[in-house]
Regions:
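ER/Golgi luminal nucleotide-sugar-dependent glycosyltransferases, focusing on the catalytic module
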Residues: 2-172
């Protein structure tokens, strides 16, 4: 299927160095004042570090195939890691994403299938002109399984109307 092959979850993404191992990231964090931290990416990296990885598998905005049994077995043996992660009332840079940790555990245990074929159209319509939006959506092809449209609540009415009409047409 699109999510499991022979019972193993399909993980879509790519291998990347940790931010602190990337020259450009280090340079921009040191010399640019308006640095914006990507807490989700850092939380993915933290999950990989907990398990001893030297780089991380970056998961994109696609549905994750997760096995409840992997969560249960890991946190049953590592209760202190779970307790530390959930102790914060709000998102905190000391936290890891549970799905990122578990996906890296699946990789470590060789109990998953890695795929660099994202089969994804991802966009933030508020950052695109209506023309760019139309172009990108019209490039949607049969080999795409997933669509992620961010911040629709912030779209201008004409873009939102176009998107909703396009989605309605797509599902008919």
């Amino acid at each position: 299927t699109d999510f499991f092959i022979d019972g193993f979850p399909v993980l879509r993404g790519k291998w990347l160095k940790f931010d602190e191992d990337r020259f450009l990231k280090k340079f921009t964090e040191k010399y640019l004042r308006n640095k914006k931290l990507d807490s989700h990416r850092l939380a993915q990296q933290k999950g990989a570090k907990i398990l001893g990885f030297k780089k991380y598998y970056k998961f994109h905005h696609v549905p994750y195939a997760l096995r409840k049994s992997t969560f249960e077995s890991f946190f049953e043996s590592n209760k202190e890691i779970e307790v530390e992660n959930i102790r914060y009332k709000f998102r905190n840079l000391n936290q890891f994403t549970p799905q990122g940790l578990i996906n890296h555990l699946e990789i470590k245990n060789k109990t998953c299938v890695l795929s660099n074929k994202l089969q994804l159209i991802y966009m933030k319509p508020i950052r695109k002109s209506l023309w760019e939006l139309k172009y990108k959506l019209n490039s949607f092809s049969d080999n795409k399984l997933f669509l992620c449209l961010q911040s629709l609540d912030q779209c201008k009415p004409n873009k939102l109307k176009y998107l909703l009409n396009w989605l309605t047409f797509l599902v008919k």
